[in-house]
Amino acid sequence: MEEEVVTKRSAITVKIGLNANNLPLEMHWSAEDGKIENAPAKAMMLSLWNPEDNNTMKIDLWTKDMSVEEMKQFFHQTLLTMADTFEKATGENLISEDLRDYCYHFAEKMDIMPEK
């Protein structure tokens, strides 16, 4: 079997504006392949798998002006997309549905259920 080789490199960048206490005041991100340049953001959760240590490295940041309501929505949507990603990556649909059920419970408890 032939070994695959890297034929292209791409970059996603995040720029964080900090205050004197190193608290994020602003965030902008760019993705060259997605044709996104300097798009504003209020929060990010970056997780990277370190294969040498079998460990997840994380960076979680949010701007000072992000409201609690926005954070609740951000977490809810992130958890839902994690269920989708897990199912796509592993084919484990039953546990992914369990996670989606939890997301429904989370939304109820946080009082962020979409109106019907």
Question: Language model features by range: what are they?
Answer:
Residues M1-V14:
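Structured beta-strand/loop patches that form or line metal/cofactor-binding pockets in enzymes
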